[in-house]
Amino acid sequence: MWPKKSWSKRLLSKRLWRYYLRFSERMVTLFRIINITFILGSTSVILVIISLFTPPFSQAIVYIFSLLPLPDMPSAAMSSPPTAYVVLGGGLTNDHNNQIILNRYSLNRARTAAGAYHDLPLPIVLSGAEAPWLGQWLMEHGIDGLISENASMNTCENARFTAKRIPLRHVYLITDSYHMARARRQFALNGINSTPLPAPLPVRRDWMKPAYNLSHSRRAVYEVAAYLRDVIRPQMDCRHAKDVTSQQLLTPRGSVAKNSDE
């Protein structure tokens, strides 16, 4: 028979050993979970990064956007047919002579409007600081009777100021497919229903041209972030219709405006 002290020490040693084994097993399990999580997370990140260079990523974003519901609108807006085209400006750039011209986004929207107009002549409303240049391009291509809203500086103002510029219930909305969901939402918030007429981006998706696909993916990611921002915390820099006068909406800006005044 062992002495009491030896037995106590042996019992304590066994308990410590069991605790150690349990602790070791738990740590091994924890490290396995961390390892699996790291592998799955790393694989997911790599797959997402790779997908940015392929067409399906941006196509999936456009599809998801198409499923998003619009805010409630007046029944008249829901039941009436489109009565005008609304073209949202996409930006300006400079040519080799340092003259201001439409950038490729705005140019594609102008071309989309021209094609739609020739198929179904309806009034064309040009919204944004790009309106004078959009109007000049359309007039050069045989389209007149344009209605310009020159004051808006962002999508929220596009909708508010267009609604103030001319009474509309339902329009064909022309912008790119990534911007479309956010733009339609803003117009719906201002009581205007919209049928999308997406304009193409400057470059097309192409499995053989990863850089083109990345351009689409970057645009898609930006619009996802902008849409969420608009829903969670509306733009602080969006002026209300009462903050601008009718004269401001009618007054063109920039070099094209000066030429037309002369």
Q: Model-found features: residue ranges?
A:
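Intrinsically disordered, low-complexity N-terminal regions enriched in serine/proline/glycine
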Residues: R18-Y19, V171, A226
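A structural signal for short, hydrophobic/glycine-enriched beta-strand patches
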Residues: P55-R218
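Short alpha-helical segments used as structural interaction elements across diverse proteins
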Residues: T29-R32, S106, A226
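Extracytoplasmic/periplasmic C-terminal soluble domains
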Residues: A181-E262
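N-terminal membrane-anchoring alpha-helices
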Residues: W2-P81, H240-Q248
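A general, composition-driven signal for non-globular sequence regions
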Residues: M1-K4, K9-L12, N103, I143, ...
